[in-house]
């Protein structure tokens, strides 16, 4: 499963080899790299030959480990690489990026991190909470800088002392979800809700805080809460079917990577039962959920790259570099599911407008590349 790509972004930057919003998965390499056949990717981003600093450019090795192959996380990786390429060109430095995806396998994750350390990576990048926690443990003695991306609650899982002052060698970007805002949309769409399902993976630390917030909100309204969980695509599919049998009127899922990976499998189960699935990221809506509410992952990826550059080029101390959070007021609605549920998108957009910074539409697809 190993995939080794060698991508030199030099003068090719002007040709826009990568797009800022596209989603890049392990199997979707640029045209000149399609012959590569492994799971890991080595990407070198360098200044153009004409750059004044190119003759003495400094090179940095960065190891990026992605937790799982899904639309949100792939979009983050894509935009980290794209932004690093731009910074490398601008500053006249070379970023040699080693990328791999552990596919939610903790043993493989540990091996990937060990490989990065064996290659003397100058900085490690953890995409999603489980990878960040593994990198924290792996760098406890070395102090190698770690920048995490899309960690929903870095304080509660012990990655940082506080968002303002992380306190160690880790900092990064958070995709913290305003759960109450999602609940508000749910009840604006259907004020008569009496039974709501919560679908998530008990083992996902990223989901824990949001699930507790959702339960408190719903119970405060006197709504019956049905919880169903799973740790794999098959288990999530069974849990979705169980929620339909339970007679829930709506389902909520936070930024849960296991459910995200399962969405293409389960979305028809909910749509055919007339149940809207409210979720914590636009990628869920891309893969068939009724609504995704949360951060712009393309922007999160770019900002993660800015933090990487600040540490490597400007000497910023991760311990004193605040975790970056984002406005997550964008509601992404799947218009195909909207129609299937008998909901008028234009009317719903007007209804949601006072509760969101932005309402946008999307159609069902596997990746963002397919809808751009």
Language-model features: locations:
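Hydrophobic alpha-helical segments within soluble ligand-binding/sensing domains
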Residues: 56, 153-195, 295-316
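Short beta-strand elements in bilobed, periplasmic/extracellular small-molecule ligand-binding domains
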Residues: 86-109, 169-170, 217-233
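Beta-alpha junction/loop-to-helix N-cap segments that form part of ligand/metal-binding clefts
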Residues: 98-161, 256-271, 275-280
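An alpha-beta-alpha
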Residues: 62, 80, 171-221, 317, ...
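Hinge/cleft segment of the Venus flytrap/periplasmic-binding protein
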Residues: 310-372
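Extracytoplasmic "Venus flytrap"
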Residues: 56-87, 98-107, 203-207, 256-261
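Bacterial lipoprotein signal-peptidase II cleavage site
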Residues: 18-43
